[in-house]
Amino acid sequence: MAVNGKKTALLVFATLIAFAAGCGKSDWKDSSAIRIKLDVDSLLNGMSVSIDDIFQEIQLVCLDSSDMISNSVYSGHNHYTFDGEYFYVLDEKSFTIHVFDSHGKFVHSSSKKGRGPGEFTMATKICYNADLNTIDVLNPIGKIYHFRTKTLEYVSTLDIKGKDLQAIHDFVPTRSGYLLYSNTLDERIWHYDSENRIANPCGIRLPEYLSIYFYAQDRFYSMGESVQTFRAFDGKCFNLDSSLNVRTSLVWDFGKRSAQLKAIPELPSAREYHGFLMDYSDNHVAAFNDIKCIDRTLIANVIYKRNLHTIVYNLASNQAKMFLKTEEGLPLVCGLVYDNSMMLLVDSHMLPEFISTEVLDEVSVREYQKATSTGSMAIIRYGRSGVKP
């Protein structure tokens, strides 16, 4: 998958989100961190990788709807979610939430556009909140709307307050409240304490000269019971524990191919940063676009040699794979993780790029054919039965 043109604007614009060392109570020592040392050139020149080498099962579900839904696989996975029974897709333009059952059958749609209770004119993410059993929608002005699962009946609005916190661009529910990401402040990661109803910074900062950020797929991912965040220029991961202590949890070591913060110049525009990224990626793993963890297996999308590559690393066996595309000719792009599966929402006209009927069972092949013939969107579900060791 070449990273250029329109795909570049959507996939790479913001892969320089770089969380620099924090202050205060944070512990930035790497002694207890997982260190993953990889020779990317040897991995790419080694044996080809089959999608069956990674997942036990791949399923496809056609979303049975005649409505045109504005969404793209390249805009990330913040506009759809799953609660174990139903899919929810937030239309990025109409602010309508479409509900489908787990088999793709259309249930109903609910327009949320407006200025009344439970309505909004801006939204950057939809998310299932397992602790509250609600569907949460983030308005970047600092509001989170709670809706009942399935019916989407409005429940309440959380108005998040915090000193200097004026905009929120990503969030993830936690047992104590929410972790928040803001791209307009030096302090990027905040914790909202539901009990005290206040947001406080976690001590993760972005270097001032990198304040010109680009679009990133996601700022958070879960590993077991913990929530992780990462800095995109080198993939270093940080664990945010229940006491708000921030510790380095994982370090990627690509040797001479590792990106270095000191090599990234101060540039005046995103366009110039894009040009630098492409040039830098000729000899370095220049950026991490996304990281996900499924059943002790890390899946990371990285920019190397001007393309989006995928790294699959099993934390139990310490075995690694890296590829541009699988031997079936398929890219593997990070999606929404639920239990031991990863889900990717794909437009019908892009299905041939992301999935092949050769890797699907008979039921999924019929769903694929229905999606392509009707122009419907589809959900690709990878590894619902678990990830291979």
Where do the model's predicted regions map?
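Bacterial N-terminal signal peptides that target proteins for export
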Residues: 2-10
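Bacterial N-terminal signal peptides
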Residues: 11-18
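Eukaryotic scaffold repeat domains enriched in small/polar residues
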Residues: 22-389
